[in-house]
Structure formats: C-alpha cells, structure tokens
C-alpha cells in the first residue's frame, strides 16, 4: 500500500469514526489529509471503496489490539487457565472502551448507516463479525466444547451488547458484567463436557 493511500485510509477512518460515514464528505477527508482529489480517486473509485478500505484497516487494528491485549493480560487472569485468553479479551476490550479512541463499534455504526445486507459496506461489516466469532472460537478451543462455534457466537453477543451499552450509556460496568456472564457460561459448558 502506498503511503498516500495509507494516509487517506487513516484520515478517513478517524473522521468516519468521529463523525459518521455518511456525514463525512470526501471534501472533509481531503481537507484533513491534505491530499488532492485526483490522488484520492487514483486509489479509490468511490467513497464506498474508501469506506471499505477503512473497514479493512479497522478490522486489522481491532484484531491487533485484541491479540496484544490477550498477550499482555492472559497471565493476570484467575480461575480456570483454559479460559485465561477469552477473559483477557474482555479486559482488553475494557481498556479500549476506557480510551479516547472509543466511539463504539465501527462495524455496528457502519452497518446501521448502510443497512441493506447486499451493500458491499454492510457485507464488509458482516464479514468482520464472522471473523470475530472465529477468533473467539480459537480462544476457547482449549475447553474442547462440543459446539464451540455456538458458544463463540454467544460470547460474541455478550461482547456486542457490552460494547453497545458502554457506547450508548457510558457504562463501563457492562464490560465487567459481560466478562462475568461469559465466565459462568463457559464454566457451565466445561462442566457438562
């Protein structure tokens, strides 16, 4: 990726997260980035293509943040060591929610602005959510649950709910409640397995 393309994507992502996807015009991205319109259109045929590129970038950022947080926080978890990585994910998400960069879930926000399921932007959001479920499934693999995919989806729903509650109500306890609920859920499944 060229440095100008990266700069455009980074600038657009920052603006889209702060102001919304539809509310942020190309002129605002150009003004903030200092890049010429011709350069933007050399890299992206449309605003939609730019949005999809920002979602791909955000997907990479999210997974990096999650992996780094898990690596940093897994050994600080108490209880069943097989759950340490998934519990660390909740702590990493709490750290994100407490940061200045937190504007809720970029993918929930984008899919709300582009609600048609066949829209390529909505498809990119749905693909991210599928990747998150796969990531969660990897984190709980040590538990050797009979239907780990369904359990991963349940934990994903807990995370989604906590992110939305934290964003809309500013209630960070939602993350702690989701973590406790996930621990109870996983414990009950692990005992039954």
Q: How should these model regions be labeled?
A:
Residues 7, 11, 15-49, 53:
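Helix-turn-helix
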Residues 27, 109, 160:
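Conserved acidic functional residues
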Residues 53, 67-99, 152-155:
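Hydrophobic alpha-helical connector segments
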Residues 56-62:
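Short, basic, alpha-helical segments at the C-terminal edge of helix-turn-helix-like DNA-binding modules
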Residues 97-119:
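Amphipathic alpha-helical segments used for helix-helix packing
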Residues 121-127, 141-189, 193:
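Hydrophobic/aromatic-rich alpha-helical bundle segments in the mid-to-C-terminal region
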């Amino acid at each position: 990726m060229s440095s100008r393309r990266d700069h455009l994507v980074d600038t657009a992502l920052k603006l889209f997260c702060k102001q919304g996807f539809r509310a942020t015009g190309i002129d605002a991205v150009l003004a903030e980035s200092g890049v010429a319109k011709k350069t933007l259109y050399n890299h992206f045929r449309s605003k939609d293509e730019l949005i999809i590129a920002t979602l791909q970038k955000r997907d990479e950022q999210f997974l990096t943040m999650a992996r780094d947080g898990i690596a940093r926080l897994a050994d600080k978890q108490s209880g069943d060591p097989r759950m340490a990585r998934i519990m660390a994910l909740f702590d990493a998400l709490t750290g994100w929610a407490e940061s200045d960069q937190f504007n809720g879930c970029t993918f929930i926000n984008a899919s709300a602005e582009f609600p048609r399921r066949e829209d390529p932007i909505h498809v990119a959001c749905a693909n991210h959510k599928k990747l998150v479920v796969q990531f969660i499934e990897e984190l709980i693999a040590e538990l050797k649950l009979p239907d780990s995919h369904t359990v991963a989806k349940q934990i994903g729903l807990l995370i989604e709910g906590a992110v939305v509650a934290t964003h809309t109500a500013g209630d960070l306890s939602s993350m702690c409640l989701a973590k406790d609920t996930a621990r109870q859920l996983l414990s009950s499944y692990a005992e039954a397995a």
